[in-house]
Amino acid sequence: MAEFLFEIGLEEIPARMIAAAESELARRVAELLQREDLLAEGHAVTRYSTPRRLAVLVTGVKAAQADREEQLTGPAWSIAFKDGQPTPAAQAFAKKAGVEVAALQKVTTPKGEYVGASSVRKGRAANEILLEALPKEIAAIYWPKNMYWRAGKPERFVRPVQWMVALLGEQVIPVEFAGVTAANVTYGHRILHGDAPVAIPAPMEYAATLEAAKVQADVEARRHRIRKALDHVTRTVPGARWREDEALVDAVTHLTEWPSVLLGSFETEFLALPEEVLVTVMRDHQKYFAVEDAAGKLAPHFLTALNTEPSDQAAAIIRHGNERVLRARFNDARFFWTVDQKISLANRLEMLQSVTFHKELGSYHQKTHTTREIAVKLSAQVRHAGTSVDEAALLRAVELAKTDLTTELVKEFTELQGIVGGLYARAQGEGEAVAQAIYWQYSPASMDDPIPPTLEGQLLGLADRIGTIVEMFAIGLEPTGSKDPFALRRAANAVVKILAEGKLPVTLDRLLNAAEESSKVENAAASREKVMAFLKERLEFYMREVLGYRYDVVNAVLAAGAHDVVDTIARAEALSAVRGSEDFAAIAAAFKRSKNILRQAAEKAGVAEDSLSADVDAALLPEPAEKQLHEAAAKLAPVVEELRAKNDYRAALEQIATLRPQVDLFFDKVMVMVEDDLLRHNRLALIQYVLRSFSSIADFSEIVAS
């Protein structure tokens, strides 16, 4: 067995694209080797990446494919042999199979007798396969954006390819791509090592060889190095700690090859600015880590990750340069904050008429009006359900929510939209409920983010997003495939998350009603089915990927209705709790069998399954087993319905499971599809009656046996 190393050296790759590309390259190489039967049992795949390279190391690679014996079938025997002598057809087939005519065999098939031959297919060498296949795998790697860099050449890639390494053991495989031929030579850190080539003696020495050339190719090792350096440098400031920011750690990990960390400072006067502004400037614009004191308050320091290992003299120069840049950014922020206060948010509302939301949907002023109407309807629904809402604060927050788009601070630091509005609202004397709702309006931006902490903030977020979704669908801008230019999936994810985690008494139907009735877009309700399917798809995603419910549990509860998000999740929780019990598993299997019987009967009759009657004639139940099932179901149905009405779904499901003896006996003793039409129809009606009576919590036929 051998090890295989493949590296692509590039000009600097955008940091946000590296992780996915590293994973895809490793997957493609491993799948290629697996597909070609070149991987031994116990093989391992290791991925590497830096801003200038993607690499994969595979152990347990066979030198060649095993020879394979193939059974080939040729022409009919009567055509291949005449009077016992081979014809040209037999000779041609023997030549194709690579055997002598005498080795041909008679093969009997259902279609008759044919000529057959056993042929040994010689396994190809691994280096031959890799040389041929790797260029296609490289070209197939997905990048959000590609570029051409060789005039008149067809290759596209994220950045120009500078070098490649392809080693099978110590053997170089001269793979060619984009005018570059692979060798056993890579390059170290651009500054710390220079342009001198670095020879890789063997695949297993890849990481160590690069380490000596001041490149840490292993991403996790680099991430650990950065975190360790952050801890170490922060300890030089008494009582300080760096503010945890995993996303920023990840970003700088993909921006560096040999990272180190430098501490800088800024004037304490800037701490008068809101912390959110300071942290955004440091994190989003400069890739600096914030430093806080023991109480968790921002300290006048920052940490920056460098892609070098500077001397003390160089570090002082770099520190001074970073401090100067940050000081300028903070001065800008302070200036914008001061200038913006001269016009209140309330006086900025009319300015939204000149800020376009979408060319077909009008300005943000119109958007605000639509959101307000939706919010009024949602507020009424919540109050009707017995929950108190500060409607005045909600509507004031809606009115002012988008006004910060006209501020200089948001124009310069767009990441702060919403947050700036909330801060300005508080500074200008708006109520705390108003300020909080505005501040949190864009949360959650991802499934990891919290929902707004106040009911008013939750309703503002819902009204804003559902209005956008409905109107975008109405003008034909729904997401397609991987394209979602208006982030409607993110908006729908937020709708589901707010409804679920806020436990809001608002159904998806009523949510869409509010948006459709409030929209000024013609035929806003025309896309209702599409929008509802879209929201249910996001609910399915949330339940499976965020809450972690099994796919069959999710399918089962969604099939029974998904208009109430909170209720749907409660049913999934109850179903998850009982699905493993023996009685419930048997009931689920019986329901699956029942559904199959009804489907087959409906197909045979040429009608829809739902149209089959559930009206049972008790006088046409001659078998004791079917009588017992009918009586038990009729007695149990109101009990289950009462528990369901109380939302006691677990107890309801446990009651349904008590029907197992009667269900088992029915299928053991009763033939449903009998010749007698009346009897058959009545038994089908009994099955339909049982299914309809006990499927309002979940469609148990969706449950898969563990």
Curated annotation (Swiss-Prot):
Assigned protein family: Belongs to the class-II aminoacyl-tRNA synthetase family.
HAMAP family linked: Gly_tRNA_synth_beta
Keyword Secreted listed: no
Keywords in alphabetical order: Aminoacyl-tRNA synthetase, ATP-binding, Cytoplasm, Ligase, Nucleotide-binding, Protein biosynthesis
Subcellular location: Cytoplasm
Gene responsible for this protein: glyS
Domain of life, source organism: Bacteria
Pfam families: DALR_1, tRNA_synt_2f
InterPro entries assigned: DALR_anticod-bd (IPR008909), Gly-tRNA-synth_bsu (IPR015944), Gly-tRNA-synth_heterodimer (IPR006194)
Gene Ontology process terms (BP): arginyl-tRNA aminoacylation; glycyl-tRNA aminoacylation
Catalysed reactions, semicolon-separated: tRNA(Gly) + glycine + ATP = glycyl-tRNA(Gly) + AMP + diphosphate
Any one GO CC term of the record: cytosol
Subunit structure: Tetramer of two alpha and two beta subunits.
Designated name of the protein: Glycine--tRNA ligase beta subunit
Organism in which the protein naturally occurs: Acidobacterium capsulatum (strain ATCC 51196 / DSM 11244 / BCRC 80197 / JCM 7670 / NBRC 15755 / NCIMB 13165 / 161)
EC code: 6.1.1.14
Cystine crosslinks: none
Leader peptide range in chain numbering: none
One Gene Ontology term of the molecular function aspect: arginine-tRNA ligase activity
PANTHER family: GLYCINE--TRNA LIGASE, CHLOROPLASTIC_MITOCHONDRIAL 2, GLYCYL-TRNA SYNTHETASE
